[in-house]
């Protein structure tokens, strides 16, 4: 079922690419070509008559996606066998069809993405997209993929930058809930998400994430492996997948040297160092034990953890780590959505309670108003009784009997009024008690609001602290960039100085070559100048002392004047007019020998006793100019 969903996502892009008019329908001829290509890449026996028979009643018109879907399920997807085809070739077919109509890369080559990188990002998008059409990738998965790519580049992106980046692309109702694949590719081509990252670095990062998520490569790298027959150690490129650990002759993975099958009964153990190998561990299978050695302890820990993860997946019956992680992330998003809905429902319930509370407060106000009216009526009644009593007292003198009767009737009426007053006081007491309970509920509500405000203030304070820390990190990053620029400037100055010294050395070597030629010409006259050797040796010693003071090994950064002046400034002394030809010849030969000895000592001082000065200088340049990879 999972494989069918993955295949349907790619086929959906191919089908929509053929739908030029955006009407949801594709002509039958185009569907024939698409079906034939799907048969080929999926290694399914081709049935050319099935499509005609399936749509026999619709020979003239186009075929919609609903009409093509039953044929696709019955004749293609139901016959697909996992492992019988190369899924990458299938994805390349669908990408080729959809990229021609929808993807427009920069034609002049300035786009950060090559066609291969765009294809791999398209596959990653299909893997992480939701199982709903049209296919979109939610912001959580976009953030997950960007963090994967940045992790491969050893970079980091703040949550604020990512939210700002996604907010810039929220231009339609669709982007409010996610990104389409073309918006996703445009995000990379625009260079907004990975500023300052080279095209080659980005391509390597995309390839690494593609191998990890799509090809289920848990880990890969060089390890030393011990052989089973000759028991010698050889360095191999290992590639770990959930079901096997393969090793190759090089990282191009062209020459496969072997495969270590992994199952639930395998185990990995750390071994002590021996035989000159350190950071050793072994993988034990049912039939054999494989010994390996990592470059350091950290690499060994990563490899053992990755192999244990693969064994755990085999024990749990799972075929892909990232499919399991994707399902867990999807379940977490659903849980967050349910919690959000529950929170909204709780807020709605609290709002209803608040409305009920306001309604009861209004009823309480009405009861208080009724109480005030009852008190006012009671006072009016009391005043009326007093006036009647006074009238009765005035009439009592003249009509005693009538007064007695009136008094009796008045007493009965007073009893009734007292009972009514008692009932009114009891009602007032009940209303006062209800008012106290409502006031207590109001105080609890006020306290809850104050607690909520305190929590909100604490959250605001934490956000301000996080912004301050982010500013500090950005300041540190700027200082590091300034330090790198200063180091590069110093490096350029050292390189210029080394180039100047190299030119001086070449000039000195040319002069040495001229001296050697003079020596060859002077060797013919050496036999005639033997009588002057002692005097010439004295002069040679004098010249050697002075030249040794001037000529020292050229060190990096040494700003001494070039030594070529000591050779160009040397001129033979003029001959006296009355010197004989023999004296001139002898004197010229002694000067040639002295120049030869001076230049030989100069060459030794330049070379520092070594006959390869240029190699020594080159090694100094290599020390000053480290390789870009370091």
From Swiss-Prot:
Gene3D superfamilies: Pleckstrin-homology domain (PH domain)/Phosphotyrosine-binding domain (PTB). The keyword Ligase does not apply. The modification Phosphotyrosine is found at residue 210. It is linked to Defects in Def6 results in spontaneous development of a lupus-like syndrome in aging female mice. It is characterized by the accumulation of effector/memory T-cells and IgG B-cells, profound hypergammaglobulinemia, autoantibody production, and glomerulonephritis. It comes from the Eukaryota. The lineage of its organism: Eukaryota, Metazoa, Chordata, Craniata, Vertebrata. One of its GO terms (cellular component) is nucleus. It comes from Mus musculus. Residues 318-341, 378-418, 552-630 are annotated as: Disordered. Residues 331-341, 378-392, 620-630 have a biased composition (Basic and acidic residues). The gene is Def6. The modification N6-acetyllysine is found at residue 225. InterPro entries: EF-hand-dom_pair, PH-like_dom_sf, PH_domain. It is found in: Cytoplasm; Cell membrane; Nucleus; Cytoplasm, Cytoskeleton. This is Differentially expressed in FDCP 6. Keywords: Acetylation, Cell membrane, Cell projection, Cytoplasm, Cytoskeleton, Membrane, Nucleus, Phosphoprotein. The modification Phosphoserine is found at residue 590.
């Amino acid at each position: 079922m999972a494989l069918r969903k993955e295949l349907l996502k790619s086929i959906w892009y191919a089908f929509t690419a053929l739908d030029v008019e955006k009407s949801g329908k594709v002509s039958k001829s185009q569907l024939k070509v698409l079906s034939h290509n799907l048969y080929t890449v999926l290694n399914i026996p081709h049935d050319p008559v099935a499509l005609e028979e399936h749509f026999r009643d619709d020979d003239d018109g186009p075929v919609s996606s609903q009409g093509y879907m039953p044929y696709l399920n019955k004749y293609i997807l139901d016959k697909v066998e996992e492992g019988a085809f190369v899924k990458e070739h299938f994805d390349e077919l669908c990408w080729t069809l959809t990229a021609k109509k929808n993807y427009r890369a920069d034609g002049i080559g300035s786009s950060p993405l090559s066609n291969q990188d765009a294809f791999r990002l398209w596959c990653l998008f299909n893997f992480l997209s939701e199982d709903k059409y049209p296919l979109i990738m939610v912001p959580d998965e976009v953030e997950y993929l960007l963090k994967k790519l940045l992790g491969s580049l050893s970079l980091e992106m703040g949550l604020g930058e990512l939210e700002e980046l996604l907010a810039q692309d929220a231009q339609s109702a669709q982007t409010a809930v996610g990104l389409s694949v073309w918006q996703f590719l445009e995000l990379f081509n625009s260079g907004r998400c990975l500023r300052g990252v080279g095209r080659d670095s980005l391509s390597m990062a995309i390839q690494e994430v593609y191998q990890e998520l799509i090809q289920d490569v848990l880990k890969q790298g060089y390890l030393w492996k011990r052989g089973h027959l000759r028991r010698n150690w050889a360095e191999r490129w290992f590639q770990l997948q959930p079901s096997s650990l393969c090793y190759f002759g090089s990282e191009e993975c062209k020459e496969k040297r072997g495969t270590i099958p992994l199952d639930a009964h395998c185990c990995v153990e750390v071994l002590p160092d021996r035989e000159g190998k350190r950071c050793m561990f072994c993988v034990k299978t049912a039939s054999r034990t494989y010994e390996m050695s990592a470059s350091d302890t950290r690499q060994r820990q990563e490899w053992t953890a990755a192999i244990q993860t693969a064994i755990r997946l085999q024990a749990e019956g799972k075929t892909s780590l990232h499919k399991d992680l994707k399902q867990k992330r999807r379940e977490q998003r659903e849980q967050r959505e349910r919690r959000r809905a529950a929170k909204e429902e709780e807020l709605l319930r609290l709002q209803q309670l608040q409305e009920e509370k306001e309604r009861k407060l209004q009823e309480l106000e009405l009861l208080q108003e009724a109480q005030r009216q009852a008190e006012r009526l009671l006072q009016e009644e009391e005043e009326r009784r007093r006036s009647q009593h006074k009238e009765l007292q005035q009439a009592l003198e003249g009509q005693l009997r009538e007064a007695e009767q009136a008094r009796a009737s008045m007493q009965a009426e007073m009893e009734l009024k007292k009972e009514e007053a008692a009932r009114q006081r009891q009602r007032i007491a009940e209303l006062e008690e209800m008012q106290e309970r409502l006031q207590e509920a109001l105080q609890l509500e006020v306290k809850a609001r104050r607690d909520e405000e305190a929590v909100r203030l604490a959250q605001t304070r934490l956000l301000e602290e996080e912004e301050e820390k982010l500013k500090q990190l950005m300041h540190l990053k700027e200082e590091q960039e300034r330090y790198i620029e200063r180091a590069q400037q110093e490096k350029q100055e050292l390189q210029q100085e080394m180039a100047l010294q190299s030119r001086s050395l070449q000039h000195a070597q040319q002069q040495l070559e001229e001296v050697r030629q003079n020596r060859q010409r002077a060797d013919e006259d050496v036999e005639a100048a033997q009588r002057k050797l002692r005097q010439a040796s004295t002069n040679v010693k004098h010249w050697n002392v002075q030249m040794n003071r001037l000529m020292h090994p050229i060190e990096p950064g040494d700003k001494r004047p070039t030594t070529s002046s000591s050779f160009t400034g040397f001129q033979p002394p003029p001959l006296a007019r009355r010197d004989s030809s023999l004296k001139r010849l002898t004197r010229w030969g002694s000067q040639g020998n002295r120049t030869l000895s001076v230049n030989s000592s100069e060459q030794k001082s330049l070379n520092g006793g070594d006959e390869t000065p240029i190699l020594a200088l080159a090694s100094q340049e290599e020390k000053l100019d480290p390789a870009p990879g370091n």
